[in-house]
């Protein structure tokens, strides 16, 4: 029997992230309708701009990735329903899968996905419906074209957990799915996880391998909130601002808005954890926003704070490690 290919898939609102045995990648969550009214190349005096990936199929035709909002009409939807199979979520995954194949070779076996979802989709009355919707669109055969190249990918297995759980297992597991020496006992202690994503800041506390519900929550004060503080007049799409932020072209604006956003995030943490964090063995800080808030959060939690070497891809990497352990 052939070996399945295990992938961790972090369904982030800021980027779709994949991690497998050879490594990982992210595709920035910019999606735009392909208007097909392109400027011709070679306009004298203007530099030709590289187009983002073009993903097409029965779902439509979309530009995907960094710069997509400059080439078509932006599609920005931060509702959780998008993760249950909206066209913009499909094309993000397809772009990521195509890029993964470009970098590591074509998939020669069926895929097994360990999917990380926002905490809000894993709790509450709608949790089962959300999870069924995610599984429904991910399972089976996927046919799509990326930049004119046809792809067929088959997903045989879909398993789901919360995104902060991925961060926890990235910390305690090695690449073989085995406990890292000295960290296995962490699962018995109380460990806090702060995931600062594009849309949400999620808090999870685990004790004896189970979630402590009163310390677990998610709120929409992620990096988008910082961008909203910068973009009060609404002159830019969130995707355009995100690109400028990643390129280091918002340093002045970020310097002015960061203290406000930092206080809002700290307020949400304080509201849920209070002083109880002092008893936690570790506080893991992950997500793209961890790079922006690293100084503030490490100051708040002192030596207990742990920021991984790649906080952006930590969740996807941990999801992959978990899938290897559970195979």
What are these regions (language model features)?
Residues 202-237:
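Glycine/GP-enriched mid-protein hinge/lid loop-to-helix segment characteristic of carbohydrate kinases
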Residues 223-261:
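A mobile "lid/hinge" subdomain adjacent to the ATP/sugar-phosphate binding pocket shared
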Residues 199-202, 241, 265-267:
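Short hydrophobic/aromatic-rich motifs at helix boundaries and adjacent loops
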Residues 1-191, 213-223, 251-282, 288-327:
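Nucleotide/phosphate-binding catalytic cleft detector across ATP-hydrolyzing
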Residues 190-194, 199-205:
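Conserved active-site beta-strand-loop modules that form the wall/rim of enzyme catalytic pockets
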């Amino acid at each position: 029997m052939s070996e399945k290919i295990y992938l961790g898939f972090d369904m982030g609102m800021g980027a779709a992230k994949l991690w497998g045995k050879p490594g990982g990648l992210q595709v920035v969550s910019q999606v735009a309708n392909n208007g097909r009214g392109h400027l011709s190349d070679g306009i004298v005096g203007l530099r030709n701009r590289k187009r983002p990936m073009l993903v097409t199929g029965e779902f439509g035709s979309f530009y995907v990735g960094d710069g997509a909002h400059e080439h078509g009409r932006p599609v920005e939807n931060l509702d959780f329903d998008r993760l249950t199979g909206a066209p913009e979520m499909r094309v993000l995954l397809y772009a990521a899968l195509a890029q993964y194949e470009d970098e590591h070779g074509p998939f020669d076996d069926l895929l097994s996905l360990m999917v990380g979802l926002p905490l809000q989709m894993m709790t509450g009355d709608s949790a089962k419906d959300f999870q069924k919707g995610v599984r429904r669109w991910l399972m089976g055969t996927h046919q799509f074209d990326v930049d004119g190249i046809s792809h067929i990918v088959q997903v045989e297995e879909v398993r789901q957990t919360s995104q902060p759980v991925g961060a926890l297992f990235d910390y305690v597991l090695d690449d073989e799915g085995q406990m890292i020496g000295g960290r296995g006992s962490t699962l018995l202690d109380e460990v806090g996880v702060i995931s600062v994503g594009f849309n949400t800041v999620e808090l999870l506390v685990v004790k004896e391998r189970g979630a402590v519900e009163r310390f677990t929550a998610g709120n929409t004060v992620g990096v988008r909130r910082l961008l909203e503080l910068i973009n009060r007049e609404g002159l830019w799409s969130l995707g355009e601002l995100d690109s400028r932020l990643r390129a280091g072209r918002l340093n002045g604006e970020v310097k002015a808005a960061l203290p406000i956003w930092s206080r809002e995030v700290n307020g949400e943490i304080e509201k849920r954890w209070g002083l109880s964090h002092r008893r936690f063995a570790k506080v893991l800080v992950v997500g793209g926003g961890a790079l922006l808030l690293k100084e503030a959060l490490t100051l708040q939690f002192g030596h207990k704070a742990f920021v991984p070497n790649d906080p952006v891809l930590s969740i996807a990497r941990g999801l992959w490690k978990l899938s290897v352990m559970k195979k």
